[in-house]
Amino acid sequence: MTFILMVGLFVLGSCDKKNDPTPNPAEDEEVSLQINSISLQDWTVGSELKFEESWSLNLQHADGSSPITFLINPNSSPIPERIEVKKGTYRYSFESASAPTFSDYLPVKLAGEFEAETPNQPVNLTGVAKSKGIVIQLDYDSSPPKLAEPQLIDFYSLNSDYYLYYNTADLLKISIPLPESQGFLTQFHLGNTAPLSTRYQVAWPENNDFYENSIKLDENKWPLTLIPTTVSHLEESQNETSGLAWIAGNLFSINDGENTNEIHQIDPFSGEVVRSIEVANATNVDWEDLAQSSTHLFIGDFGNNMGNRKDLSIYKVLISDLLNQDAVQAEKISFNYPNQTDFSPNNMNHEFDCEAMVFQNDKLHLFTKNWVSESTDHYVLPSEKGNYTAEFLENLPLTGLLTAADLDPVSGQLILMGFRRLGSNPLEQWLWFYRGLSETHVQGEVRKTKIGIIPHRGFPEGIAFWEKGNIWISSERFVLEGVYNIPPQIGIVGLEGLF
């Protein structure tokens, strides 16, 4: 797909024509040319482009005569002046001298051929962009968005949009001002996998949370929708990735039931498994989530789709062993639910499945995946080895199936992640936010944000706070024969600036 920009040419000068002692009058007849458009291969965002102030466009006649160079202004549209050339076949070329890491203009390389045959001959130039572009569209008045990392740069303004051209594979962090506020949104953008052109649209105020790959803010400036950034696809061995933990600058993941009893260290930017650590004295019946204290990693073996398990457990591993050994030993915490009396198999039709857990103040907080009500029950357990009956604390009416949880180690913010199975827009991925977590209940009113749909991003499974309140998320493979085949992946959701 190409992007077509209507432009004109302004002729400032050319070299002399080649002398021919016996000219053919028909061949020497001149025609007037005007550039109609510039088409860039695979440039899809339909907004105005900004080029260098001038280009030196080279024209080479097929008869081998000396090239003609025209100095043109590619940003003017239209310009009435014409190029006068003799009839014939011409090759044209232009290439920007450099492609800066960040710039306010789009460097290009143009090449092609045209026939100069008729008066007022239209010419369409084609080429490729040498950099990529980001456009941010805000439907409210604001100061310019900023590139926050790896450099601090204001986005440039062009008509009603803000834009920046870049030539780097780095992960870019963008700060987008919230309306009438000192707060901001954080949007990540990965240079090496992003398309040539990307548009981020922010709408305010909105009450429609239908997911359209845009950011929608409600009247209180809370994001109804956010755009996750996929940073890698995971190896096939991680098709059933289920839980995440960020420890000492490393990302760890587990697979769920019927997989190995291993914790995997993942390179989030390549998706490769750096190493696998066996939990030698543990069995993976259905590992679902990870939680951590300052000294230990907890593995939740409490997946319970059928509702008939009597061996629910949590494994406790020393972080010092995890970071330095390829095989570790675990302590075991066994538990049951105080209100479960029926253990007959009841596939996905009960309230005793669990995929989410956090650690706080020597306690493990569990949040169930309630298949019937699409709410979650909040239980608490001691974090020491032993056999316990979990203590029921509260029910949270989320209207979704919960698959992961984590606590921000800095702010104490609690985030739950899951998806909606039912309703008018099924298979949506959601985040639920609480101000914090006490010993007996979650704190603050719930706020929620949609982050995508399963047919585009896979099943949401793991969540881990990264830095400055931003989060890693993982999704397991999603297959619908002949329709979808979404590989497992790691992504980032920018939350910095919201709290």
Label every model-predicted segment.
Residues D42-S66, D141-F155:
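Short, ordered, surface-exposed loop/turn motifs in non-cytosolic proteins
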Residues N220-F499:
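Sequence/structural signature of beta-propeller domains
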